[in-house]
């Protein structure tokens, strides 16, 4: 039997072991006719474990992609590589699920992320630690039914104050409700950006919507009352680097909140939730 890496390199199996031993124990490679075939990441994994010997400098892959692969294999999963993704399952009898590898510097559009058929991601950070994320398209709903029909704006000394607004709208300023730019544009029905569209839609969906500036987000939202804990931070996304998204998820987690990313698809506001996962097996 020939032992071949997909790039054409030949290797030997150490200690008299057979291909079936490596396939069963390490879940690597497959036999085609009279050839035991490995991809370069499987070969590098076995090489580092001192299970195969190769004379040539054969590995020319992405080291972070390899480290993601090694982490998945080390978690006891069955792993196949498909382009820039891993197909993973917990056992021989379970179904494969796609786990997409996300380089830190990949630029994504919201539409790309929203329409992605993967809902599990793995990235390797600058300290070479593997981190998992889940993505879910969600239809978020609050429980407020606020009435703005009688609301108006009073301009005094260059400041804008809300009149006849819900108690949460604006901030208290000597007994008046001082408005921010989003609130002013909302009452004036003046939409200047997609972020304004998201702001208006969140209120329509029954949320209290407040600034998320101190959390590095566009908004923080409450389902019913500001006396409750704000569960979600909301960011608007058009295009972003993956590391910016991952950082926002981490910051939300650090303040015991979850991150919702919003965007516009076919002129409609839509939402996805992205969270860090400690154990990938819980969602496979």
UniProtKB/Swiss-Prot annotation:
GO MF entries: lyase activity; nucleic acid binding; tRNA-intron endonuclease activity
Q: Which Pfam families match?
A: tRNA_int_endo
The secretion signal range is none
* Active site, renumbered: 222, 229, 257
**Catalysis performed (reactions):** pretRNA = a 3'-half-tRNA molecule with a 5'-OH end + a 5'-half-tRNA molecule with a 2',3'-cyclic phosphate end + an intron with a 2',3'-cyclic phosphate and a 5'-hydroxyl terminus
Superkingdom of origin organism:
Archaea
Q: What's its top-level EC category?
A: lyase
Q: What is its EC number?
A: 4.6.1.16
What job does this protein perform?
Answer: Endonuclease that removes tRNA introns. Cleaves pre-tRNA at the 5'- and 3'-splice sites to release the intron. The products are an intron and two tRNA half-molecules bearing 2',3' cyclic phosphate and 5'-OH termini. Recognizes a pseudosymmetric substrate in which 2 bulged loops of 3 bases are separated by a stem of 4 bp.
The similarity annotation says:
Belongs to the tRNA-intron endonuclease family. Archaeal long subfamily.
Q: What is this protein called?
A: tRNA-splicing endonuclease
Q: Gene name, please?
A: endA
């Amino acid at each position: 039997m020939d032992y071949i890496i997909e790039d054409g390199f030949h290797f030997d199996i150490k200690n008299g072991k057979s291909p079936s031993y490596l396939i069963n124990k390490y879940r690597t490679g497959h036999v085609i006719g009279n050839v035991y075939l490995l991809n370069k990441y499987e070969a590098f994994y076995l090489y580092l474990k001192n299970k195969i010997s190769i004379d040539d400098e054969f590995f020319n892959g992405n080291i972070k992609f390899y480290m993601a692969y090694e982490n998945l294999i080390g978690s006891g999963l069955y792993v196949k590589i498909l382009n820039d993704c891993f197909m993973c399952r917990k056992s021989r009898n379970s179904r494969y699920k796609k786990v997409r590898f996300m380089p830190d510097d990949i630029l994504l559009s919201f539409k790309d992320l929203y329409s992605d058929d993967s809902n599990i991601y793995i990235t390797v950070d600058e300290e070479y630690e593997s981190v998992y994320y889940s993505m879910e398209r969600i239809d978020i709903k609050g429980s407020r039914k606020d009435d703005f029909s009688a609301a108006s704006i009073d301009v005094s000394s260059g400041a804008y104050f809300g009149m006849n607004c819900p108690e949460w709208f604006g901030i208290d300023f000597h007994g008046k409700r001082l408005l921010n730019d989003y609130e002013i544009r909302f009452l004036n029905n003046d939409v200047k950006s997609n972020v304004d569209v998201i702001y208006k839609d969140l209120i329509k969906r029954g949320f209290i919507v407040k600034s998320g500036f101190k959390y590095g987000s566009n908004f923080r939202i409450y389902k019913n009352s500001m006396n409750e804990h704000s569960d979600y931070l909301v960011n608007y996304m058009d295009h972003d680097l993956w590391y910016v998204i991952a950082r926002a998820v981490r910051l939300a987690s650090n303040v015991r909140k979850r991150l919702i990313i919003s965007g516009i698809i076919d002129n409609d506001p839509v939402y996805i939730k992205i969270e860090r996962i400690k154990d990938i097996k819980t969602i496979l």
